[in-house]
UniProtKB/Swiss-Prot annotation:
Binds 1 Mg(2+) ion per subunit. May bind a second metal ion at a regulatory site, or after substrate binding. PROSITE patterns: RNASE_H_1. Mg(2+) 1 binds at D10, E48, D70. It comes from Aromatoleum aromaticum (strain DSM 19018 / LMG 30748 / EbN1) (Azoarcus sp. (strain EbN1)). Monomer. Mg(2+) 2 binds at D10, D134. It catalyses: Endonucleolytic cleavage to 5'-phosphomonoester. Keywords: Cytoplasm, Endonuclease, Hydrolase, Magnesium, Metal-binding, Nuclease. The lineage of its organism: Bacteria, Pseudomonadati, Pseudomonadota, Betaproteobacteria, Rhodocyclales. This is Ribonuclease H. Its cofactor is Mg(2+).
Length: 153
């Protein structure tokens, strides 16, 4: 039987661009793992993407995953927009380069190994796991500010 995993992710940025952080919670049954990290000069969207990428990369074998994100950019990007971007050679409908192409490619690759359902949740609306993922992302921002360099925990 294929493992089923719930993943809750969030990204945060102090300034946009500015120091940023990402956080994720991976849950399989009663087991949970928290991961987080940050970068000194980034954007909120990059941190939202990186949270999902790092969570999916942590999985050692193919799983059925439900990824919960409060980022419509991530949810719509991976489930709707990416198909057109790829068909147009990573260009938008307006023929502009896709922003964060490097991370979209990485997310596409990481997600391709799994059966993923993308779930959007309203941020800062009392969703317990989303609030926890936000705390992890803010931990990443704080660590970057203290160390002045990229971090992971």
């Amino acid at each position: 039987m294929t493992d089923q995993i719930e993943i809750f992710t969030d990204g945060a940025c102090s300034g946009n661009p500015g120091p940023g952080g990402w956080g994720a919670i991976l849950r399989s049954g009663a087991h949970e793992k928290e991961i987080w990290g940050g970068e000194p000069h980034t954007t909120n969207n990059r941190m939202e993407l990186l949270a999902v990428i790092r969570a999916l990369e942590l999985l050692k074998r193919p799983v059925v995953a439900r990824v919960h994100t409060d980022s419509q950019y991530v949810q719509k990007g991976i489930s709707e927009w990416i198909h057109g971007w790829k068909a147009r050679g990573w260009k938008t409908a307006a023929k502009a380069p896709v922003k964060n192409e490097d991370l979209w490619r990485a997310l596409d690759e990481a997600a391709s190994r799994h059966q993923v359902q993308w779930v959007w949740v309203r941020g800062h609306a009392g969703h317990v796991e989303n609030e926890r993922a936000d705390e992890l992302a803010r931990r990443g921002v704080d660590a970057v500010r203290r160390q002045g360099a990229a971090v992971a925990g």
